[in-house]
């Protein structure tokens, strides 16, 4: 009996249970909206619809870019079918420091610290690093979260006053 109680505690401590995706009819999707393709959260960059043929529904052809890897993905779906749409959240954090490739971030509203995000690779990471070193103002990074993943996808400088 005590084992059952232990299982309940583990269940209670789980995440909030908010869904990572919601369904939306394929024909209702639009360019620049988000959609799940092959299990990845993507932003639609092109859409085209084929006419209804003698063997079924009109088809929607989508070209989308993975919001985290920037890889191009394509999908074709009957217009009446539902597709999963990821819940994408964007937040700004103040970049405090960079240590061992990880960013130390502060939420400007709650002042809570966050230090579990990797510095982006390539040009974006280099320009953010340079902006922090120049110390021309606070570096605000844009963090995008979807489907259990988080990444820094942009930044801006908030000048000192």
Swiss-Prot record:
Annotated positions of the Hypusine modification = 54
Report the source organism. Answer: Caenorhabditis elegans
User: Family per UniProt?
Assistant: Belongs to the eIF-5A family.
Q: Which gene encodes it?
A: iff-1
Q: What Pfam families does the database record attribute to this sequence?
A: eIF-5a (PF01287), IF5A-like_N (PF21485)
What InterPro entries does this protein map onto? IF5A-like, IF5A-like_N, NA-bd_OB-fold, Rib_uL2_dom2, Trans_elong_IF5A_hypusine_site, Transl_elong_IF5A_C, Translation_prot_SH3-like_sf
Kindly list the biological process annotations in GO that this record carries: gamete generation; positive regulation of translational elongation; positive regulation of translational termination; protein localization; translational elongation
The record ties this protein, via SMART domains, to: eIF-5a
PANTHER family on file: TRANSLATION INITIATION FACTOR 5A FAMILY MEMBER (PTHR11673)
UniProt protein name: Eukaryotic translation initiation factor 5A-1
Q: How is it modified after translation?
A: Lys-54 undergoes hypusination, a unique post-translational modification that consists in the addition of a butylamino group from spermidine to lysine side chain, leading to the formation of the unusual amino acid hypusine. eIF-5As are the only known proteins to undergo this modification, which is essential for their function.
Is Protein biosynthesis among this UniProt entry's keywords? yes
Subcellular location per UniProt equals: Cytoplasm
